[in-house]
A protein has these predicted regions:
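Catalytic cores of enzyme domains
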Residues: 20, 27-28, 56, 60-220
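Non-catalytic, usually N-terminal nucleic-acid engagement modules in DNA/RNA processing proteins
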Residues: 1-65
Length: 220
């Protein structure tokens, strides 16, 4: 998967996922005989993406489709090479639960697989070497030894701890345009607690994706 563009990958323990996920949202809900969940992560957009305006960044700033392509190919490869039934885990929302409830938590898969840890920046997973990544998962009946979650959380970074000690805020808190982030750091410089106002974030970050609302504003 690295040759195809993945930066990191790991195997999540299916039984751990079943214990943590809400009822009906563990891997076995999608594939009853699943033995392993493979999680992989790809990097974000190019450096130039961050020099573009907000409207442009809304369309080119993420690379999750590359992660999905790699995962789809991996599922086919496992079936061809090992003869074990596999599926690309759909990243879509549950049509019976509305627009905010996914069929599976790709974030949880990655966290349990040890390729990301939750941060103060809106609970985004961070990797100590690759930072923020986009994730995809493969469910397979091939039994693989599971990896473990990260022992050390890369968040907060020492420089963030220093700023928090001086101002009471980490950089992500300070520069969030809608003040949707809050939290605290303990005496050892470790993440103590965090709060993320998802509604405030969505109102700002998805304004260029919510086409109906844009049209409504135009008609007003």
């Amino acid at each position: 998967v690295e040759k195809k563009g993945a930066l990191a990958f790991g195997v999540a323990d299916v039984e751990v996922l079943e214990k943590i996920a809400p009822d009906g949202y563990g891997p076995k809900a999608l594939m009853p005989r699943v033995k392993s969940v493979i999680s992989l992560g790809v990097g974000g957009g190019t450096k130039g993406s961050w020099a573009a305006n907000a409207k442009t960044l809304a369309y080119i700033g993420d690379t999750e489709t590359m992660a999905y392509r790699i995962a789809y190919g991996l599922a086919f490869m496992i079936e061809k090479k090992f003869g074990a039934r596999s599926i690309f885990c759909p990243p879509d929302m549950d049509p019976e639960k509305g627009a905010r409830t996914p069929l599976q938590s790709l974030k949880l898969h990655a966290e349990v697989a040890g390729i990301g840890a939750r941060s103060m920046a809106g609970d985004i997973l961070l990797h100590p070497e690759f930072g923020m990544m986009y994730y995809a998962s493969v469910f397979t009946e091939l039994e693989l030894p599971p990896d473990s979650p990260m022992e050390e959380n890369p968040c907060p970074h020492p420089s963030c701890v220093k700023l928090h000690a001086q101002t009471g805020q980490t950089p992500c808190m300070k520069f969030c345009p809608v003040d949707c982030l809050s939290g605290s750091v303990d005496e050892e410089g470790k993440l103590k607690e965090m709060h993320y106002d998802a509604h405030a974030c969505a109102a700002m970050s998805q304004q260029y994706e919510a086409i109906p609302n844009i049209l409504l504003d135009m008609m007003d």
